[in-house]
Regions:
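NAD(P)+-binding Rossmann beta1-loop-alpha1 motif at the extreme N-terminus of oxidoreductases
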Residues: 1-26
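Short, charged/polar "capping" segments at the starts of alpha-helices
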Residues: 7-12, 76-79, 128-130
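Rossmann-like NAD(P)(H) cofactor-binding subdomain of soluble oxidoreductases
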Residues: 23-107
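Rossmann-fold dinucleotide-binding core
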Residues: 79-158
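Helix-loop-beta segment of a Rossmann-like dinucleotide-binding subdomain
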Residues: 107-122, 170-180, 232-243
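Generic structural signal for well-ordered, non-membrane alpha-helical segments
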Residues: 127, 131, 184-192, 245-253
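Active-site-proximal catalytic alpha-helix in oxidoreductases
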Residues: 152-196
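NAD(P)-dependent Rossmann-like dehydrogenase/reductase catalytic/cofactor-binding core
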Residues: 193-196, 200-270
Length: 270
């Protein structure tokens, strides 16, 4: 694990603590404070926020490990990232997990496969041996995963869902109780459906189960969303994340709707 500052001190001094179902566990992890040019790894997993990714890739560019798995929420294509760290090194992905670090303890959990497995795929959709190697690692680690032919489309579709979900928290005076706000649930359902319809019109909507959400009556979807927000799943994977990362979600909100606006104008010109 590459860590710096206070987090490095915590890991070196106390190990990695994580919260299980009934108790807190400790595991020893090997830590490094820098990535040296001659260090060699089969995969480098990059798990930073989008506004930190280019700086991180600048550091990685000095190292010659062949595969950089970018587990990052983004709407941008991957060309600029490849220019920074080298063409052919980026393997775009997104984790099927959620949680946060509180008091130095990791409180996180894998998402069920039916909701969102860890997702990855080669740029351009080609098959590769490193895809198979990464899939093998996930299988041996009992991490649900899926390989998709167009990761950029998947990430746009993901943002079309998650941004309205996060926006609802920020619009409420009582974000911990939004499940009871029928008007806000209806508005969130409407926004989500509108996003997915636009993405589908552009031929980018995936996975296929999102078509069911797109075509669901708004009132029915609002009821489903209310139950999701009220659930332990909603608390762990939606509420905590939104409350810990408002700036990230606000930036993604702006980038997503700017993307829609720009590509709508381009379509109208054509």
């Amino acid at each position: 694990v590459l860590a710096r500052g206070q987090r490095l001190k915590e890991l070196q001094g106390h190990g990695l603590w994580y919260r299980g179902k009934t108790r807190t566990h400790k595991v020893e992890v090997k830590t490094i404070s820098e990535l040296k040019p001659n260090d060699r790894y089969q995969f480098i997993f990059l798990t930073v926020r989008e506004n930190q990714v280019e700086e991180a890739l600048e550091d990685i560019s000095k190292n010659k490990s062949p595969n950089v798995v970018t587990m990052i929420n983004t709407i941008k294509p991957y060309g600029r990232w490849e220019k920074i760290c080298g063409k052919g090194r980026i393997l775009p992905a997104f984790p099927g997990a959620g949680g946060c670090i509180e008091g130095g303890i990791l409180d996180a959990q894998l998402l069920p496969r039916a909701i969102q497995p860890t997702t990855f795929g080669e740029i351009g959709g080609r098959k590769s041996s490193r895809e198979e190697a990464l899939a093998y690692i996930f299988r041996k680690s009992h991490i649900p995963y899926q390989i998709v032919p167009e990761m950029h489309h998947w990430q746009i579709s993901h943002l079309g869902v998650i941004i309205p979900l996060a926006d609802a928290y920020y619009q409420s005076r009582h974000p911990e109780k939004i499940c009871a706000n029928e008007k806000l649930m209806t508005l969130t359902a409407y926004r989500m459906k509108k996003n997915l319809k636009w993405i589908a019109q552009k031929g980018m909507l995936c996975p296929a189960k999102l078509y069911m959400i797109k075509d669901m009556p708004t009132g029915m979807l609002a009821g489903v969303l209310s139950r999701v927000y009220q659930s332990e799943f909603g608390n762990r994977f939606l509420y905590r994340h939104a409350m810990h990362a408002p700036e990230e979600f606000q930036r993604l909100h702006q980038e997503f709707y700017n993307y829609m606006k720009t590509h709508t104008k381009e379509s109208n010109k054509a």
